[in-house]
Curated annotation (Swiss-Prot):
Biased composition (Acidic residues): 192-205
Listed name of the protein: Ribonucleoside-diphosphate reductase large subunit
Class of the enzyme per the UniProt entry, highest EC level: oxidoreductase
GO biological process per UniProt: deoxyribonucleotide biosynthetic process; DNA replication; negative regulation of tumor necrosis factor-mediated signaling pathway; release from viral latency; symbiont-mediated suppression of host apoptosis
Site (Important for hydrogen atom transfer): C587, C813
Subcellular location(s) of the protein: Host cell membrane; Host endosome membrane
Organism expressing this protein natively: Human herpesvirus 2 (strain HG52) (HHV-2)
Composition bias type Basic and acidic residues, residue spans: 16-26, 164-179
Biased composition (Pro residues): 141-159
Gene: RIR1
Residue ranges with Polar residues bias: 119-132
Amino acid sequence: MANRPAASALAGARSPSERQEPREPEVAPPGGDHVFCRKVSGVMVLSSDPPGPAAYRISDSSFVQCGSNCSMIIDGDVARGHLRDLEGATSTGAFVAISNVAAGGDGRTAVVALGGTSGPSATTSVGTQTSGEFLHGNPRTPEPQGPQAVPPPPPPPFPWGHECCARRDARGGAEKDVGAAESWSDGPSSDSETEDSDSSDEDTGSETLSRSSSIWAAGATDDDDSDSDSRSDDSVQPDVVVRRRWSDGPAPVAFPKPRRPGDSPGNPGLGAGTGPGSATDPRASADSDSAAHAAAPQADVAPVLDSQPTVGTDPGYPVPLELTPENAEAVARFLGDAVDREPALMLEYFCRCAREESKRVPPRTFGSAPRLTEDDFGLLNYALAEMRRLCLDLPPVPPNAYTPYHLREYATRLVNGFKPLVRRSARLYRILGVLVHLRIRTREASFEEWMRSKEVDLDFGLTERLREHEAQLMILAQALNPYDCLIHSTPNTLVERGLQSALKYEEFYLKRFGGHYMESVFQMYTRIAGFLACRATRGMRHIALGRQGSWWEMFKFFFHRLYDHQIVPSTPAMLNLGTRNYYTSSCYLVNPQATTNQATLRAITGNVSAILARNGGIGLCMQAFNDASPGTASIMPALKVLDSLVAAHNKQSTRPTGACVYLEPWHSDVRAVLRMKGVLAGEEAQRCDNIFSALWMPDLFFKRLIRHLDGEKNVTWSLFDRDTSMSLADFHGEEFEKLYEHLEAMGFGETIPIQDLAYAIVRSAATTGSPFIMFKDAVNRHYIYDTQGAAIAGSNLCTEIVHPASKRSSGVCNLGSVNLARCVSRQTFDFGRLRDAVQACVLMVNIMIDSTLQPTPQCTRGNDNLRSMGIGMQGLHTACLKMGLDLESAEFRDLNTHIAEVMLLAAMKTSNALCVRGARPFSHFKRSMYRAGRFHWERFSNASPRYEGEWEMLRQSMMKHGLRNSQFIALMPTAASAQISDVSEGFAPLFTNLFSKVTRDGETLRPNTLLLKELERTFGGKRLLDAMDGLEAKQWSVAQALPCLDPAHPLRRFKTAFDYDQELLIDLCADRAPYVDHSQSMTLYVTEKADGTLPASTLVRLLVHAYKRGLKTGMYYCKVRKATNSGVFAGDDNIVCTSCAL
């Protein structure tokens, strides 16, 4: 095996056949020390007790798979021991070659450090990449004697020359793997080694994935949410641990003299070997010198990095410490083949040059030109070290990677090359995200260029404020340096949220300007928080800070909550806040009340087109246009115009939007609308694939449908046109039913069997994903004032906003959401943190309402009169999993209602506090139920508030001072922003445990990292690989792939939305409903039968259940899992609602 420690230097050369002979178990010599692998019984590393260096060997040289959660195998015979001083105590250490179980004989070798403190005989466990933690015994330290005695080597250098590496990440990396050094790939250099390698594992020639897969069995991986799980892994806690604290600073370091071309293996600068053959065997000399290159000094026994010496603080490079093409090429030649074995070796030179340059440049200012710093190279080295611990074959860092362009190309090569492997590794998913953030860093511009950019177009007032606080902003930027956060073990740093989060920033949210520059994440949140601070009123500052604070204090208040993803603005707000493009509203509800074709076309080309031009999502009520003649469809030509208009706007837009047409089920064209999408469209002139449809269902339809389902014969439904329907759409409840039945009694309309229309609805939903279903009477019944005679006639694009709209006024809503996963700490939900997040979100959205521009006068009136906001949630399912709960559990049912109540209570209290501080109530407050002291939840018989005292105090204050806003809680999908937060969307369960989408740019993968970590805690070795193979075959459904698990097993919690009973999901929405004064975008997830059919009764049953539970939204999307295992159908994927989906 290549790069094996020179064991033969002490034991004498043996033939390959001798090394392969099985040996009897041995015991430690009396008075000596022995080291054993805790995971394997009967395998022991033995030491002799001669004078001089201790000799160690494995009692069984065959490959031995360690137990659960261990991915390493032991392969060796005798290794040289060394004496070294560790934290003032004499210690014995040895270095034993180990090999990855899947890599086998491909020559991939790492080095494990074995050691203990001085004292009587004891045991010390072999460190592996699983735990890296040791039981420390007290072996007797042999004294060096005679002329061949080896003096103690100097303390090890930092692993690559960066001073910060003395402070390694405590959540993952060297400190968790202190027993294992980084590995490299090298070919065999002798026949015996070739034979040994070839016999070690028969899977040598496997692909990258299979060759690396066993590392996924490594124990507890880096947990980005370390506070989410209090369970410990299988690693052994040391009896005695001697670690250097962060505050101690780096230990004194004596770096070895670097090897220069022409140096002999025995050169004192390298540390001459002491065993036989060391002067003639270069590999033996190099390996014997590995003791001088252990990892960071804070560990008790640190890993050996490489046989190639690292370069010290006085490296003696043949060129100056200045980054130029000539110098970089010279260093590459100087390092020679070592760069192939150690891909990050060039980074050491880059780092030292950057450190020297930092001494010459002045402190960073707004005008400072962006440059790659020591911390940038440190971030790359951190990522490479983590990837090497996964035994990945890394390309060497190119000599020109000190330039932003080539560093970006190298990071891209790594991301594209290893992206497919994230499906099985949460750690790799996180590390590739770090590389994408580094790629973003290479395109960063100075603050001055960013502020002056015409493409960014910053608000003038914001620019002035930023200039006034230049020094503080530069300090904050340095404090949030990603590398500093990593090495100081700051949990949940933004750059570690995963690959999908980083890509979403890079591809969608960060502005591009100046040809090739990109807004940095820090600049984006500075833009948003700075603008919010500029527009915050005196009352808002008192609410947020408890006093009349400064701009800088308000900036920090918003910035930290945004940067930490406690609150998330809507997509238009994230893109436009802080710029002079003041359009931040998300949802628009338009009801032109047009009754003719010409009036409808004017509304579409006027109001609707203006909103689409600002990328707003539209809900368009078309009920009034209903003049079909026999055999014709009056509405379809107008809808074709709308479809083309949406397609034209989206073609040139970086943020596609959409429109949804609302009709009541008695509209004369309803059957034509149900056939306008996909394969149901009979002819191209009737096809409208770029828009959605929604049915505004009265209770009467479901009352009659239930009668049919109960067995009643000849239950009918009537369709009316404009001339016969009169003002039917203006009424709801009993008044609607009386008028509808009166029209039927008079013989008006077309009568059809009700089951025919129900089947057409279900067929369209299962085939195209729509129509969406909303319940007209529930919406109007729970609105803040009586709408009888002017009933609310539609909702927005995503069915979660409830607003009146008319020819004169359009409904407008501004959105934001709170990240519930950030409220979980040590498996406990922090309701204080939730209240704080909701308060900040309410203040943010009120600033948006005050500052936003509107595309039409109707929208301006709707925005100003009602000041409606929609505070949503994201990460509910993620929070549930982090707490160790299942959505089916009684504990979660209670938590679900508790969260909704706290959100509404905190939002209304904040809105009321604004009025207490001098803000005026919304215009229609006096006609609302709030004026009389009534709350939304009081109209629900199942509501049982737990904060009755707070509600009563709010009631009194609300009646006295009013409310700044008319509506508060709207549970939207949060499809886009949940990706940058790396949590589940909205309130829905995870769609799948491995999201995969193939586009022309490649495959996008987003694994459920919580599931991967639970799998690693449960299985080990081949069992883990088998479990993942089974999950792959079953679309990552744990219930289908692992049916033998005990019902109480932790893995049973990881169900997908398709695995849950849909009636349970409807019940969860109903439990929240009293505290959701808008509505909820509830998607239904159904699975085809084994024969590929989906009974219509399945969807009918679910819609009837949603109606009976009193919901406002009966179905947003209908997503169908195919029985053929070919994926999930969810309607037209080309239309993405990023406006209200955040």
